[in-house]
């Protein structure tokens, strides 16, 4: 049987949920339980766009392991429901070749831009390229760390816009999720989180989506509010991510700061909602 294209699948989906994040573990840590509920909803189509490799200046096996960790989180959510149908490949958007991976109704796109570091200064391994420098015109372009594509700021926005439009064709009930770039609401967040959020807000179709805008690192200061069931799925999704990363490259994410990751895992999301425009 021929596999359905995204456009054919869209006709069967009653809702599209697009999650756009900078790093492979952002959606597990800061957007739960929303991602889980959307993934297991039978008529929801879930698209994850991960804008950077999250390489932190390390060797290639680290960012590759992070991608595998994200895939493990998806499989963990879906495997109890039905057999898994997995595919992968590349799609072109604005002549940029973008890697994708699909599992049932969930698709992840990996743009693999270089990690910009917490403050946007980047890392020596990628010649200090970053989305922060790109947005501030401190550099004219930034290249994916696998050399698959080169972007200026407008092209970065356009590629996100093109992926979102391609996947949402024919679906009226549209939701888009991203980390809040407003430092007054979401202070002291990673530069890649902020730049990705700013880009999402500039896509041409943004007003046709219901927007859910999340707090990132600062959510650790909020009280733990997850139910036992929601905590089970959130902690489990991060645990399988962490295991995949460690198994594949020997790096322990938890070793960075165990107490902080516990807070992130035990805390529910802090969300601002922006409704879709009635004029669209």
Predicted regions and their residues:
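Extended hydrophobic/aromatic segments used for targeting, binding, or gating
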Residues: 189, 194-246
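Active-site rim/loop-helix segments in enzyme catalytic domains that contact anionic ligands
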Residues: 3-168, 201-202, 235-243, 254, ...
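Short, conserved beta-strand edge motifs with alternating hydrophobic and charged residues
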Residues: 111, 175-180, 213-215
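A generic structural signal for short coil/turn motifs at secondary-structure boundaries
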Residues: 56-60, 184-188, 222-225
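Histidine-centered active-site/metal-ligand motif
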Residues: 23, 190-193, 280
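Short, catalytically relevant binding-site loops at active-site mouths
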Residues: 115-116, 182-184, 219-220
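Terminal low-complexity/disordered tails
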Residues: 225-280
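Active-site adenylate/phosphate-handling loop in enzymes that bind or generate adenylated species
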Residues: 156-202
């Amino acid at each position: 049987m021929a596999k359905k294209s995204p456009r054919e699948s869209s006709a069967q989906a009653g809702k599209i949920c697009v999650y756009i994040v900078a790093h492979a573990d952002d959606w597990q840590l800061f957007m739960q339980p929303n991602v889980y509920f959307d993934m297991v909803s039978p008529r929801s189509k879930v698209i994850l766009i991960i804008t950077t490799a999250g390489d932190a200046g390390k060797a290639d096996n680290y960012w590759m392991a992070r991608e595998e960790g994200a895939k493990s989180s998806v499989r963990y959510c879906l495997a109890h429901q039905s057999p898994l149908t997995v595919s992968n490949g590349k799609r072109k958007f604005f002549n940029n070749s973008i890697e994708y991976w699909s599992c049932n109704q969930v698709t992840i796109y990996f743009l693999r831009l270089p990690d910009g570091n917490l403050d946007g200064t980047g890392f020596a391994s990628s010649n200090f390229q970053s989305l922060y420098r790109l947005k501030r015109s401190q550099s004219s372009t930034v290249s994916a760390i696998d050399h698959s594509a080169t972007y200026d700021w407008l092209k970065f926005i356009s590629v996100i816009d093109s992926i979102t439009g391609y996947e949402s064709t024919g679906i009226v009930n549209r939701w888009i999720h991203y980390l809040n770039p407003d430092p007054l609401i979401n202070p002291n967040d990673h530069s890649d989180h902020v730049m990705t959020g700013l880009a999402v807000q500039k896509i041409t179709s943004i007003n046709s989506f219901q927007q859910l805008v999340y707090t990132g690192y600062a959510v650790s200061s909020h009280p733990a509010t997850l139910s036992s069931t929601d905590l089970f799925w959130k902690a489990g999704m991060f645990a399988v991510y962490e295991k995949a990363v460690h198994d594949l490259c020997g790096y322990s994410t938890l070793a960075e700061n165990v107490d902080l990751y516990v807070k992130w895992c035990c805390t529910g999301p802090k969300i601002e909602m922006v409704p879709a425009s009635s004029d669209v």
